Amino acid sequence: MEKENQIFGIRAIIEAINAGKEIDKVFIQSDAQGELMQELMKAMKKHSINFSYVPVEKLNRLTPNNHQGAVATIAPITFVKLETLVDAVVESGKTPLFLILDQLSDARNFGAIIRTAECTGVDGIIVQKTGSAPVNGDTVKTSAGAVFNVPICKVDHIKDAIFYLQGSGIKTVAATEKTEDTIYTIALNEPVAIIMGSEDRGINPSVLKIVDEKAKLPMFGTIGSLNVSVACGAFLYETVRQRQ
């Protein structure tokens, strides 16, 4: 973790949250207590900030300073509002292409996906505030800097983002093996948002219920699945092919 992207100390983190800083995640000492810690918990809940309980040894590795049982990571980018981004892309007259990541949790996979998204002309990436990979040094490095070129939106709930996209005339397509349709039978040369699931659980069943279409990649080997960043690349480049 880069030291310039850290905030340590309970009061400092509370002030950063209240000031609107882009907090990616807060690491809290597992046995931390007290009124100030309760105040921090309330602030994180109010602003839907991701956090996890960790042993004090991990906090000591993150910073040699007096962390008081809490260390936060700050995003190296500024996130954009979903409505602002979608409306601007729709009004631009181009054929929108969005990518939704349903609680993808690995920062390196996130970075690899951002890199492919930038190369394929994705207009924006949408992630959920909780349960998603942070935008940290690993993300920036794996993306080869593409993270600074692709708008990223953080939303409270993926389903609300899907409803907004659908209401804006954008078709939502879920990448899932729970369908008979392959990617090659789905029309991707129209306004579309592709949804990729987490590494271990895939797309949430409640999300699958509300998408417009589902598609899978044909598999011919004995291994039943691909790494999510590889699968995402296949979906995005099929979209590019159809739009040529």
What are these regions (language model features)?
Residues 15-21, 87-181:
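RNA substrate-binding interface of SAM-dependent RNA methyltransferases
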Residues 31-32, 56-57, 130-132, 199-201, ...:
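Short, acidic/turn-prone active-site loops that include or flank metal/cofactor-
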Residues 45, 162-166, 240:
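Surface-exposed amphipathic alpha-helices with a cationic face
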Residues 1-88:
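N-terminal positively charged helical leader segments and presequences
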Residues 14, 20, 141-144, 205-244:
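Structured adenosyl-cofactor binding patch, chiefly the S-adenosyl-L-methionine
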